[in-house]
Amino acid sequence: MSDYKKTLQLPETKFPMKANLTQREPEMLRKWEKDDAYGAMVRASGQQGTYVLHDGPPYANGNIHMGHALNKILKDIIVKSRNLQGFKAEYVPGWDCHGLPIELKVEHELGEKKRTMPAHAVRKRCRQYAEKYLDIQRKEFKRLGVFGAWDKPYVTMHPSYEAATARELGNFAAKGGLVRSKKPIYWCCSCQTALAEAEVEYHDHTSPSVHVRFPLRDPRVAEVLPGVDPAHAYIVIWTTTPWTLPDNMAVAVHPDFDYVVVRHGGDFHIVAEGLLEACLKAFKWDEHEVVARIGGRALEGLKATHPFYDRPSPIVLADYVTLESGTGCVHTAPGHGREDYETGLRYGLDIYSPLTDEGRYLDCVEFFAGMTIFEANPKVIEKLREVGNLLAEGRITHSYPHCWRCKKPVIFRATTQWFIAMERNDLRQKALDAIRDDVRWIPSWGQERIHNMIEFRPDWCISRQRMWGVPIVALLCEDCGEAWNDADWMRDIAERFAKHATGCDYWYETDLSDIVPAGLRCPKCGGDHWKKETDILDVWFDSGTSFAAVVEQREECGFPADLYLEGSDQHRGWFHSSLLASIGTRGVPPYRSVLTHGYVVDGDGRKMSKSVGNVVAPQEIIDKHGAEVLRLWVASVDYREDIRISEEILNRLVDAYRRIRNTCRYLLGNISDLTPETMVPFEAMDPLDRFALDLASRAHERIQDAYTEYEFHKVFHTLHNLCVTDLSAFYLDILKDRLYSSAADSHARRSAQTALYRILMLMVRDMAPVLSFTAEEVFGYVPAALRPDVISVFALPATDAPAFTLDTTSRAAWEKLLAVRSETTKAIEPLRKSGEVGHSLDTHVTLFADPSLKATLEGLGSDLRAMFIVSRLEVMDLADAPADAWTSEELPELKVTVRKAEGEKCERCWIISADLGTDAAHPTLCPRCTAVLTGTGA
C-alpha cells in the first residue's frame, strides 16, 4: 500500500492550537510597547476624520474592579474599531485624584499628626497616595490590552488641570452663576462636609415615627372655627426626624385640601380629612367626633405654639403637602429641608440650624445642648411625652439618604455654601433643551432620566469643607463675613496655579499679601481685613470641567467630544456635572452622544459584595483565563443592562473563543503556500468560493455597522456564527477535499486559498477591537508574502477591507442550495442511524427537483457532489421521482433518494468510485487523484 498522505496538501502553520493566553498576553503587551502599536494605529487612520471618546476619570484609589474592566474594555473596543474604520480616534485616559476618599485614607494614616500639619503638607501626602494608585491602575488597565496615551494621561491634580478647573469657576463668576448663600444642603456629620446630590446613596433605614400636636392658642381660632375653644385646640404633624423639632418654625398645610377638627375628650385636633382614618388608627382613638371642616387656605396665618418651646409656629401654605402619609400638616424647619427652606423664604421665617459640623446641638438649644442629633431623638420624644404633646410613637423603615463614602445617614443642614445657581442665565432650561435637542442618549431612556434629574434638582452646592481639592478662589472679609470673588482676579489666580510646581498648593503656600489685590476693601462694610476661603470645590466640579482642561486643550481631542461612556450612575454624576459646567460657561453640551452601561453582577444577578463573598476581581479572571476572555465577555453581552459574570459564563466563552481561534488556525494552515501572484481574481473564482466570500463580506458589513452603533454583542454573535455555521459547518467542511486532494497549484485549490485568505483578513480586522491579542497573533502568522506591510494589525488602513459581494439573484440561488443541502442531510440520516452508511461520503444521492429548482442547482456552476459531501450526486426531474423517495416538508419542489454508493473508496481522497485503478501504477486511486499525481489533471 502506497503512503498517499504525503501527496495531500495538508494544512501547515506554526500558529499554535493552544492559546496559552496567560503566558502569551504579557509577551504581546511588550511587543505593542516596543512597536508603539497605539501610535502606529493612530498614524494610519484619519481618512474619515476624527473621533473623540473622552474618558471619564476613574478614582485613583485601590485596584481596579470588574466595573472598571467593563468600562475600559468598552472604550478600547470603540477606539480601535473607529481607527480601523479610518477615523483618527486617540484615547487620553484620565484619573480623578482629589476628594474625600483619599483624604480620609491619609487622615487615617496620619492620625493625630494631621491636626498640627499645614495644609500643603497634608495635600502632599494625598498627592503621593493618588500617584501610587494611579500607577497601579495604569498597569492593570494596560494588562487588559487597552490602547491609549498611557504616558500622557490627564490627571485632575496636575497644575494645568487644577488651573483649568479654577478658571472655569471664574467663568461662572463672570456670568453671575456663582453664588454664596445659606441654604439647607446634604451634610455628613461623620465626614463633616457638604455633599452633592451625586454623593448621596439611598438605603433602608429605621427611624422613629411620631405624631405631635402643636397647641393652637390663637384667639382667631374661635372666629375661623366657631365652637372650637382655642385653649384646647391643636394642629397635628407627623415626622420621622424628631431631632429637627427644636428647629421648627412653622406648620404647613395644603391650600386646596379639606381639613377636619376632631374632638377627643375635651381637646380639638386638626388633621387632613383624607388622612383621618389613618390618624385615628395611629392615635388609637375609638371615640371621636368630627365637629368642623375647613379648607387649608383658611388656616393660613393662625399661630400655633411650639410643642415644648415658648415661641410661635405659624400655619403656612405649601403645595408640596401630600395625602400619602402623615396628617396633611407638615412640620416645617427651614434650616433642615429644601422645601421647608423655600417656604421659610416666602414667609420670612428664620433659617435656623443650631448644629456643629459633627451634628451636635449648640449650647443655645434648650434641653438638648451638646447632644448629637441621634442622641437627641429619644430625648425629644421624652420631652414631648412630658409636656403632653405626643399623640403616637412608632418605628418606620424607609429609604433614607446616606453618605456615599462612610455609608452613614446624612442630614439636611442649613450652612453658608457656594452654589452654581440653576436659574441664573437660564442654566436649567438651557440644559434641558440641550438634553432634548443636541445629545444622542444610548440607551434612549437615559434622556428621560437625566432630564428629570436636571428639571427638579436644587442649586448645585459646589463647596466642601475639606482640604484635598481645588480651593474656591475667593476672599472673606474678617469684619463682616462678606465674600469677594472678582472673576478676572479668580482667573489670574488660576494662571498662577498653572505655573506652580504643585498647582493649587499655591493657594495654601503663598502669603495672603501676595493674593489680596492692593487696596482692596470690602464692598459691604469697607473693611480691609481679609482671609482666604478654606472650602474646596466639589470633585464633581473637578471632573465636570474635564472638557475645558482636556477636550479643548489637547491637540488630539476636539470640542465637543463625540462620546462620553460610563456606568448608568453617571447620569447623576459626571454626565450631569459636565453638562451643567459646559452649558453654564459655553452654552453648549460637552458631548454629542452619551452611552451608559449597567453594573456587573454575579451569575444569579446579585450585586457583588465582599460580605456576600461573590466579588470577582479582573485579575483572577486574567490569571486563570487571560484578558482576552474578559474582553470577549464584554463583547458577548448587552452591556446596557446589568451584566452577569460567573465561572459557568466564562467557561462558555472559553469554548466560543476556542472555536474562533481554531477557525483562524485552519485558515492560516491552508494558505501557507499562497502568494500574491497565485491568487485568483474574484470574478474568476469557483462560484462556491465567491459565495463564501459573500457570506464573510456581509458578516463584515454587519460587524462594522454593529461597531458604529455600539452593539458589540452583535459583533461577537456575528463573528462566532461566521466561524461555527458559515465556515466550519458549511464552507470549510466542503472545501477540505478540494484543498487537500487537488494539485497544489491548480485553479481549484488557488481559488479556495484566495477565498480563505480574503476571509481571514476580514475576520482579523473584525476581531481586532475585541480579541486584540489574538488578532495580532493571527496577523503575525499570515505568510510574509501575503501580510500587509504594517507593524500591527491595528495599523491596517481602512481601504484594505474591500467587499466581495454577490448580486441578489446569485445570493438567492445559493441560499436555495443551502436549503436543499439541509434537506438532503435529513434524507441521509435514516441510513446513518441504521448503520447502512457511516458518513455522507458513503452515499449516492439523487435530487428530484421541479424545473425551477433544477435550473437553479445546475446553474450554480460548482461541483454539487462536493457541496453535498457525497460520493455521487445526480439531479433529475421531480416527475421521475420514485414513490418511495424522501419528501421534503420544507421544499415541496424537492424529493431525494439515498443509497449506498457503488464502488470502492479511493485511498487518497476517500471518495467512493467505481473507476478505481485506471492507472496500473495507482490501482487504489480514483481518476481525479490519479490525474493529480501524474500531472495530467487538477
Curated annotation (Swiss-Prot):
Q: Any binding details for the cofactor?
A: Binds 1 zinc ion per subunit.
Q: Name one GO biological process term.
A: isoleucyl-tRNA aminoacylation
At which positions is motif 'KMSKS' region? 607-611
Binding-site positions, Zn(2+):
906, 909, 926, 929
GO molecular function per UniProt: aminoacyl-tRNA deacylase activity; ATP binding; isoleucine-tRNA ligase activity; tRNA binding; zinc ion binding
Query: Any domain commentary?
Result: IleRS has two distinct active sites: one for aminoacylation and one for editing. The misactivated valine is translocated from the active site to the editing site, which sterically excludes the correctly activated isoleucine. The single editing site contains two valyl binding pockets, one specific for each substrate (Val-AMP or Val-tRNA(Ile)).
What protein does this entry describe?
Isoleucine--tRNA ligase
The gene behind this protein is ileS
